[in-house]
């Protein structure tokens, strides 16, 4: 558990540690592992002092025999610091990829013989005037992140995300969803921070609105969806974000578990899907479950965006009665329609 005050104190310490090590837009921080509190602190600490952070899909490290995508990203970024939560889990990629002179920072389980720095050491750095100066220098065009596209059409491509992009997205969200200012959001989310949906949209909604984020250690796959179910029994979100396959995996549990269904819908203001089309039958099942539990439909909406737009381009900010609607251009956004040739 981490409060906003504690997060700021620790982010400043990490920011000081990164400045002392000379990190910059030319030599950023690179993250190999999944969502975690330490991952969030590194991300916040880096952005606090104007150092870009590049979260990389853990699958590139753990599901690949040759770690080719990580090699390509490392060669492009030339990171000055590489973080992994578990040194044993990521030992393969740490040994296979040439990270140059980058400092390897590990949360736990440092492999024998590998030179590395414990993550806790970053938190020991004293934050002084240099952090204040660096923070004051952060502006709209400061690079916040390098996010990498999924690589579905080739090698992952690096996308620059500036503070202007992140902040304008959140300004648009608050204009479209004014209820966020009335009640701080409570979100349980598994969506990865190496992807724009989980990081720039969901994480930043919590950050911008003083909300509470519970990191879901489950995923919509057999053997891990059960963790999400267990977490939803304990946490009643006010907004629930997921991709269509996530809802497909969750719905059978909601249908048969009265306690889970009660917890899920107790405080729910909004159901949000994105990243793919939601089949109409799943939409109807979610509607039926909501009516069964609370006697009325829960508002369901969607959005359309891209890594390059950090991420929102269009948004549904009105009630709809079917899936497949991507909404209207978000405030500050223009969309040009071109013929499909």
Question: Model-found features: residue ranges?
Answer:
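Conserved structural elements of the adenylate-forming
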Residues: 8-14, 125-129, 140, 159-180, ...
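Gly/Ser/Thr-rich phosphate-binding loop
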Residues: 121, 209-211, 229, 238-241, ...
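Conserved pre-ATP/AMP-binding loop-to-beta segment of ANL
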Residues: 105-107, 111-148, 155, 179-186
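Conserved AMP-binding/adenylate-forming core of the ANL superfamily
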Residues: 1-44, 61-71, 118-127, 161-163
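Structural core segment of the AMP-binding/adenylate-forming
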Residues: 21, 48-121
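Conserved AMP-binding/adenylation subdomain of ANL enzymes
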Residues: 167-186, 196-241, 245-262, 334
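Conserved AMP-binding A3 loop
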Residues: 2-6, 135-136, 144-171, 316-317
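Conserved ATP-dependent adenylate/AMP-binding module captured primarily in the ANL superfamily
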Residues: 60-95, 128, 169-188, 221-238
């Amino acid at each position: 558990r981490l409060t906003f005050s504690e997060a700021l104190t620790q982010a400043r310490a990490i920011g000081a540690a990164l400045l002392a090590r000379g990190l910059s837009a030319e030599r950023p921080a690179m993250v190999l592992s999944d969502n975690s509190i330490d991952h969030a602190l590194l991300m916040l600490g880096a952005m606090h002092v104007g150092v870009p952070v590049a979260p990389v899909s853990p699958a590139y490290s753990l599901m690949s025999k040759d770690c080719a995508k990580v090699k390509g990203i490392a060669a492009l970024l030339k990171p000055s610091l590489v973080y992994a939560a578990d040194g044993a889990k990521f030992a393969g990629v740490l040994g296979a990829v040439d990270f140059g002179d980058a400092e390897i920072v590990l949360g736990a389980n440092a492999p024998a013989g590998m030179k590395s720095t414990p993550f806790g050491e970053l938190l020991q750095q004293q934050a002084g005037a240099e952090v204040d100066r660096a923070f004051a220098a952060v502006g709209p065009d400061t690079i916040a992140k390098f996010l990498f596209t999924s690589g579905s059409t080739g090698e992952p491509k690096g996308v620059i995300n500036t503070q202007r992009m992140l902040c304008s997205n959140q300004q648009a969200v608050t204009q479209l969803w004014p209820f966020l200012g009335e009640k701080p959001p409570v979100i349980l989310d598994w969506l990865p921070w190496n992807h724009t949906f989980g990081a720039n949209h969901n994480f930043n909604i919590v950050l911008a609105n003083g909300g509470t984020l519970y990191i879901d250690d489950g995923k919509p796959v057999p053997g891990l969806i059960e963790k999400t179910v267990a977490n939803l029994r304990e946490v009643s979100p006010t907004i629930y974000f997921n991709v269509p396959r996530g809802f497909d995996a969750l719905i059978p549990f909601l249908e048969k578990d009265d306690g889970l269904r009660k917890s899920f819908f107790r405080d729910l203001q909004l159901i949000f899907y994105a990243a793919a089309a939601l089949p109409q039958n799943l939409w109807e099942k979610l509607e039926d479950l909501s009516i069964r539990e609370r006697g009325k439909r829960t508002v369901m909406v969607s959005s359309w965006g891209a890594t390059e737009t950090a991420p929102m381009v269009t948004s549904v900010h009105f009630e709809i009665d079917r899936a497949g609607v991507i909404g209207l251009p978000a405030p500050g956004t223009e969309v040009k329609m071109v013929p499909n040739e």
